Every structure is written in C-alpha cells, then in structure tokens.
Design a protein with these regions (language model features):
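Conserved acidic donor-binding segment of nucleotide-sugar-dependent glycosyltransferases
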Residues: 337-348, 357-363
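Membrane-proximal helix-turn-helix segments that form the acceptor-binding/catalytic region
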Residues: 123, 136, 151-169, 184
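Short alpha-helical donor nucleotide-sugar binding micro-motif in glycosyltransferases
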Residues: 99, 164, 283-284, 291-296
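Conserved donor-binding/catalytic core segment of Leloir-type glycosyltransferases
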Residues: 15, 171, 209-240, 251
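Nucleotide-activated donor-binding/catalytic signature segment of Leloir-type glycosyltransferases, i.e.
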Residues: 260-284
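Short hydrophobic beta-strand element within catalytic cores of glycosyltransferases
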Residues: 321-326, 330
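Aromatic "clamp/platform" in nucleotide-sugar-dependent glycosyltransferases that forms part
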Residues: 110, 304
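Carbohydrate-associated surface elements
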Residues: 52, 176, 196
C-alpha cells in the first residue's frame, strides 16, 4: 500500500524508543505502530529500540532492530502486566549502537529507558523529540494516588529534568497537554500536534441503528482500558440515576485490571432490577468496534485522565453522538460539538442527566446530531499529522526548531 501523504525529499534514519511496542489494547503503542508504518511507507528508515513481542506477534511492524530484554518489576509487576504492558531492561551498548545509526530519535514514553536514551543522544549530538503520551496521574491512579498533588508534581518535575529538557522538541497531542506543560518553562519548544487517526480503518459505511431488534432499546458503547482513571465505574453508577436505565443496553469494550470489579458492579445492576439487559464486556478489534459503533445510539467516554482520547474519535467519526467527561486532566471533551455532550468527570448523576436528555430527544435527533460528527476525524487525519511530524524531524536534523 502506498501512503497518500506527501513523500519527504530526504530519507531519514528515525529511531523509535518504546518499552513495549507490541502490546494490544494500549493506545500509546497502537499510535506508535501506525506512525512507524506511515513513515516507512514514505521512504524513511525507521528502527525500533524496544523489548520484543512476548508472544511472537510483531503486530505487522516487525521485531525490534535493537531488542532489549523484558524487565520484571518487583511488587508491581502483576499490576503492570494486568494493564497489558511490559518494561524493557536498559542495555547501554544497545542504546549506543542504535544512536550511531540514527539521524533523529523519537521517545514515546517518560520512563527510565527514555531518560537513558535522552542523555546518551544529547551527548552523541543526536536530536530527540519526545511525545507527552501520559500524565503522572495515569500511573498513580492505579495505586489510588492520582489526587496526591505533591507526588504528581514531583513526577512531572522528574520527567522535565531527566527527559524533556534533554530533548529538542516536546510534542503535545492536545491543547490540554500544552496548557499543562507551558507553565513549566521547558528548555525545548512545544509542538501542538495530534497523534492522529487513520480515517479509513474499520469504516465500511454500514449503519445499523434502528435496524436490529426492538427500536425502543437504547444502545450505549464505551471504549477504553478497564482501569480507575478510565472510570467505567461512573458509567455503571449513572445507570442507577437514569430514567431510561431499563431500556439501555450497554457495551464496555476493553480489558484491564478493574474488569472483575466492573463485572460485579454490572451484575448488581441486573440483580437489583436497575437494568433488564446484561452489560456486555468485550475486547474488540478495529472492525469489530466499527460494527458495534454502527448499531449504537450513544458513546460515553468517562475517563478522568486522558492525554488525547483518540479511541473516542474513532467511534465518533462513525456518526455516534457522544457524552464525554470534562475535567482538568482529560482532553477528550475537545471532540464534543455541544455542551449537551459533556458532563463533569466523575459525576454519575450529571452523566445520567446527559444520557436522559439525548434519549428523550428521540432517535431522529440522535441521527441528525451524529451526522455532525462524521467529518470530525478529518481534522485529525494521521496522514496530515505525519506530514507535520516529518517537518519536525527535518528541522531537528537541520538544527532549526525555532518554528516548531
């Protein structure tokens, strides 16, 4: 397949640095794989410094040219594994080999591996770009410390000193991230650039809304890793306050450490008579997710902590009306086209009211509003995003980042 984006005049040697490129169900890794694929299609030489796939599945991008052994983390190893993730053990000799080849480095995380590579790249004179993919609270939420402001500020300061200030450019995937980083007075400039979504992936044009079964059923979809910060628990609590709960059919797409608790919460709703249809839990591929979205009336995105939330956009562009959490650490509400499609993060009663408002407007109103979202993805076309990323790489290699 030939990428429809432009072709860069000069082929670059681009080194991607990520602990685990091959995990599935992780938006960071999926975004990196898409970007790597497009860059290769445009003629660039892209190599990867990462742990190899544990199950042998290279996810279509090939095994890492610079493999690192997987690292077992004491105490929290099982928690990390439950998030579908793995850390790589640093091998400085391998890092140096990779840097000898690279024109430019792209760091995908703010962890120890990236700190070492950032330091070595700076010493070797190889420019590095880092993408801000996660907040400190994405990490601390798993151990119930996401509201420990001092701790999270300390983590961000550590990232600033060990990684960000050793790079030449910091990519901010959303305005929300830019607003958080701008007051930190980082040494490198900030680049406001979405990670982007592939407009054609998983879209077959079919729309089954109202075609399946009882037209009185309200089908709601939520997508995201099952974890505290994604806050699927608020969606389930909201059903207790919804006037239309008994008409709602809810599907939660994902997997993760809170699945057991969420299933128990969903079972209680059914046994208490709050809902009449069991909540469906499933991990879906892109085509499966597209089919599910084509039959849904509403999409709910409840995450309290979200750098960009492209999983939401991949559903909305199929014409589904959203109800999205709004808060200081979540950027996903940027996709909402009206105030009626937002609620305050963590407020289950407010979410219930928002759902009820859309249900009471009727199916035709949902179809009309959903049509407004079909073109939304064009603003975040990954091909256009990679165009700008290429420009950034070229400026870094030529030591001109003043216009980033």
């Amino acid at each position: 397949m030939v990428a429809r984006g432009r072709t860069c005049e000069r082929s670059l040697n681009i080194l991607f640095v990520i602990n685990d490129l091959y995990t599935r169900g992780n938006g960071l890794a999926a975004s990196a794989r898409r970007t790597i694929t497009l860059l290769r299609e445009r003629g660039h030489h892209v190599r990867v410094l990462s742990a190899p796939p544990l199950d042998g599945d290279d996810c279509g991008v090939g095994v890492p040219e610079y493999p690192l052994p997987s690292m077992s983390v004491p105490v929290v190893g099982s928690l990390i594994a439950s998030q579908g993730y793995a850390f790589a053990r640093v091998r400085r000799a391998q890092v140096k080999r990779a840097l000898q080849w690279a024109d430019v480095v792209h760091l995908e995380e703010p962890f120890y591996l990236q700190a070492v590579v950032a330091q070595c790249a700076r010493r070797a004179g190889v420019p590095a770009l880092v993408t801000y993919h996660i907040h400190p609270e994405n990490l601390t939420a798993s151990i119930y410390l996401d509201r420990a402001c001092l701790l999270n500020r300390m983590i961000l300061e550590l990232w600033k000193r060990a990684i960000f200030n050793r790079c030449s450019l910091v990519q901010c995937p959303s305005q929300s991230v830019w607003d958080r980083l701008e007051p930190l007075a980082l040494r490198p400039p900030l680049l406001l650039l979405s990670n982007g979504v592939p407009l054609g992936e998983g879209v077959d044009g079919a729309d089954a809304r109202g075609d399946e079964g009882d037209s009185s059923v309200v089908r709601i979809l939520a997508v995201g890793r099952f974890s505290r910060e994604k806050d699927q628990a608020t969606i389930l609590r909201a059903l207790r306050y919804s006037s239309h709960a008994r008409s709602i059919e809810l599907a939660l797409a994902g997997r993760g450490p809170t699945e057991r608790a969420l299933r128990a919460q969903a079972s209680a709703l059914l046994s208490d008579g709050v809902i009449t249809r069991p909540v469906r839990f499933a991990f879906m591929s892109a085509p499966e997710l597209a089919r599910e979205a084509s039959r849904c009336d509403l999409y709910v995105h409840a995450a309290r902590i979200e750098v960009e939330g492209l999983s939401a956009l991949e559903v909305l562009r199929l014409g589904v009306v959203p109800v999205i959490a709004r808060g200081p650490l979540t950027a996903t509400s940027q996709f909402a086209l009206s105030g009626d499609s937002m609620y305050e993060a963590g407020d289950s009663r407010a979410l219930a009211r928002a759902i009820d408002r859309w249900v009471e407007r009727g199916r035709q109103a949902l179809v009309s509003e959903g049509a407004r979202y079909r073109g939304l993805g064009e603003r975040y076309d990954i091909r256009a995003c990679v165009d700008r990323l290429e420009d950034a790489y070229v400026r870094l290699v030529s030591a001109d980042v003043s216009h980033a």
